[in-house]
Amino acid sequence: MAIPLPLTSCSPISTSSSISRTSFVPLTLRNRTFFSNQNYSRRVLISCSSSLSSDNGSSPDSMNGNGNGNGSSLNGQSSFPRLPSFDGTSKPPLKWRRVLLKVSGEALAGDEEQNIDPKVTMAIAREVAAVTRLGIEVAIVVGGGNIFRGSTWAGCSGLDRSSADYIGMLATVMNAIFLQATMESIGIPTRVQTAFRMSEVAEPYIRRRAIRHLEKGRVVIFAAGTGNPFFTTDTAAALRCAEINAEVVLKATNVDGVFDDDPKRNPNARLLDSLTYQEVTSKDLSVMDMTAITLCQENNIPVVVFNLSEPGNIAKAIKGERVGTLIGGTWNSIVTTTS
């Protein structure tokens, strides 16, 4: 019984001789790469051989291997070209296949006075587009500090911390929708998922659905933090990273990385190349809050802190190139790519 294959292109390129004719049909299978070491645009060549009559008029039996031709045989050698084995898991040689990008609200503001700088969101969109073409799956968590920061407003005018944090979560949704619109304007399929239901504007966060979106090549933006007050969006980034099995948290900020002192106060502050989780906690470095750092440490999730405003930094970080400060890993394990 013939099993239909999901052909999306079929244009035979034929070669012939006095013995056989072979058609090589480029076969495109969705979301599959058929060679372990190189990217062949998800195509595989299938050889469809049929024997022509030879000088003595005999023809092979393709089912039992009888005959004197070069036809296909179940019991002997096949005239089909041998393809590299494929188990469905081969990937191009990139360090990370699925990443979580954390974009702070302050970084989205840029130099604008209207809370969100369209030039910043467009720069993010273009660099994300460049890496998704390589097959890297990208999820994003956005902050809301450019619009409202709950921890700052708590206690003001009778506003309790929980209420202030919920307002901050709504601010992240505003940023997420803006970023989604920017990405889709340049052709990047994007979904926004919120930690609590806002069905008129976004999907609810469902782990399996988020992973499926990523597998289909869509960018997923997680908004509304964890959905609970008293937790930062950095913690939300660490949590979502662990849940969707992403390999790294890439924290895009408005500084070059982690310094041994505040560079605003100390012009001689030194940019740190890499750190362990223990060094971050023992030195009380302002990287992420302790809940986020602990969550990353317990799940062996490395964190890269880098400057969002430097052109090309997002793409470099996503591809695993050396940029900013690496926490919980070693640069030697990072593959530098030039694709």
Swiss-Prot record:
GO molecular function: ATP binding; RNA binding; sequence-specific mRNA binding; UMP kinase activity
Keyword check for Cell membrane: no
Known catalytic reactions: UMP + ATP = UDP + ADP
Effect of loss of the gene: Reduced capacity to grow photoautotrophically associated with low levels of many plastid transcripts (e.g. PSI (PsaA, PsaF), PSII (D1, CP43, CP47), Cytochrome b(6)f (Cytb(6)), ATP synthase (AtpC), LHCs (LHCa3, LHCb2), and NDH (NdhH)) but abnormal accumulation of others, altered plastid translation as well as a strongly affected plastid ultrastructure (e.g. almost absent stromal lamellae and swollen grana stacks) with a large number of plastoglobuli and reduced photosynthetic performance due to strong defects in the major complexes of the thylakoid membrane.
CDD domains: AAK_UMPK-PyrH-Ec (cd04254)
Region (Involved in allosteric activation by GTP): 110-115
Organism domain of life: Eukaryota
Residues given in the record as ATP binding sites: 102-105, 145, 149, 180-184, 189-191, 253, 259, 262
Tissue expression from the record: Expressed exclusively in leaves, but not in roots.
Signal peptide: none
Pfam families recorded: AA_kinase (PF00696)
Chief location: plastid
GO process terms (BP): 'de novo' CTP biosynthetic process; chloroplast organization; chloroplast RNA processing; regulation of photosynthesis, light reaction; response to light stimulus
Subcellular localization(s) per the UniProt record: Plastid, Chloroplast stroma
Subunit description: Homomultimer. Homohexamer. Forms RNA-containing megadalton-sized complexes.
Family: Belongs to the UMP kinase family.
Protein name: Uridylate kinase PUMPKIN, chloroplastic
Species: Arabidopsis thaliana
